[in-house]
Amino acid sequence: MKCPRARVDIFKREIKTRELEPTEKNVYHGLTGPISLPPHNPVSIRFQEMVSWRLRSAVIGFFLLVSSTSGSSAASIPSAPTPDATRESPTGEPHRDRALSTETPTPEPSRDGGSTPEVLHVVTGPVRPRDRDPILERLAEILAETHSLHQLLTPGTGPREDEDEVFARALAAAEIAIGSVADRVMWKATLSCMLVVTSLVFAGVALWVIVARHGHFRVIPHERSRDWSPGL
């Protein structure tokens, strides 16, 4: 039985005496002579064996699904409910569009001498409006604050207050306006950014899987000259 050192010498001798063509691919010239490398990276081969065509199809399909739904979900903005223009009145005639009506809706008087703002008389009779949209409620608050500020700043229209009160009301109106816009926009922008990042990640994974399947990920050292030596 030969010692390990003798086996090392045998391997070195085989490497030095190996005859290879100068134009052969995957040849690395080192200190001991030309060494033939495997045609593919072993890591890439194992990865190709693990990844099947079903997994690649699932990744590509999921990426297409996410990219198609990102635009639609980001563009879907809840709108205020619109009244039903085709609903029939008690007399049997359909309601006309409120926007085309020239009559001004008047509040229905109540028994105590006041008015009931929830019930409005239109062309075809009394109609109770539906629940108002939160955006419209916030806009009504902003208009009310603006009207109060106009009364405070305009002489002769109301009691004058000190500058601190005016500044506080103006700051409150600005906070209401900014909050109403931020609450409606920030979550949509965040959702859109998350969907775009997810789509890019899945696109990169799908592209990497496809390219790795064709064997483009190979770690092959650059071929050096046969005349290379440590002294150069």
From Swiss-Prot:
Topology of this chain in the membrane: Multi-pass membrane protein
Amino acid composition bias (Low complexity), ranges on this chain: 71-84
UniProt name for this protein: Putative membrane protein ORF8
Species: Ictalurid herpesvirus 1 (strain Auburn)
GO CC terms, sorted: membrane
Principal subcellular localisation of the protein: membrane
Subcellular location per the Swiss-Prot or TrEMBL entry: Membrane
Domain of life: Viruses
Residue spans crossing the bilayer: 166-182, 195-211
Keywords: Membrane, Transmembrane, Transmembrane helix
